[in-house]
Amino acid sequence: MGGGRRDARTTGKKGQPWYIEIPLLVVIALVLVFVFQTFVGRVYQIPSESMEPTLHGCAGCTGDRIFVDKISYRFGDPQPGDVVVFEGPDSWNQGYQSIRSDNPVIRTLQDIGGVIGIVPPDQNDMVKRVVAVGGQTVGGCSPDGGLLVDGEPLDEPYLNAEPALERNPLNCAFGPVTVPEGNYWVMGDNRGNSADSRFHMGDEFQGTVPEENIIGKVRAIILPFSRIGTVPSPDINAG
């Protein structure tokens, strides 16, 4: 009897060998990363100056890394003032160059990395601020040079204080454009140095971005440490 009890205590299933367990854990981790990046959120790096001073980026420097929430817009629509990441419509992609290697082996590895979220996707993703939504009319200048939406000036405290006006004279003197339902008019905070909706008014969407192209809402800057913080979505129609 006593020997039987000892056998019951000492008998059990052995764990998997390390050479099976470790690859299995890696696969599980990659699946979890894929699920998170696909349905919950993703980290992006800012490549240009178009969203200064809200988001820092420039050619040849290390731009802000931002966390993009993919859940919020499953339960609601983007609102004026939101900073969003979106996939560029066709007219926005002219001149876009693939970020994948010409080497087929490396390219395949990059594609796999893109699927699981450890390598940027090979698509022209952009970050801008929603200025007007479906049914609103955007364009024209107020007496003090502010942008008009539905004839009223926006309250835009986030704008770059010293925009390079000589590089982009269309800060508010365009349109007016009535945004199609389900689409969004987007612009950079660095209004004088941003190739945004204003530059695509001749396309099929009149420069707007379709809802299905919206990837998510920018919630926070996570790197560098000196710039960690949330990215606000002010009520820009309050003016």
Predicted regions and their residues:
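Soluble "head" domains of membrane/secretory-pathway proteins
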Residues: 2-23, 35, 39-45, 53-239
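Hydrophobic alpha-helical transmembrane segments of multi-pass integral membrane proteins
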Residues: 27-35
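A short acidic/basic microdomain associated with nuclease active sites
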Residues: 48
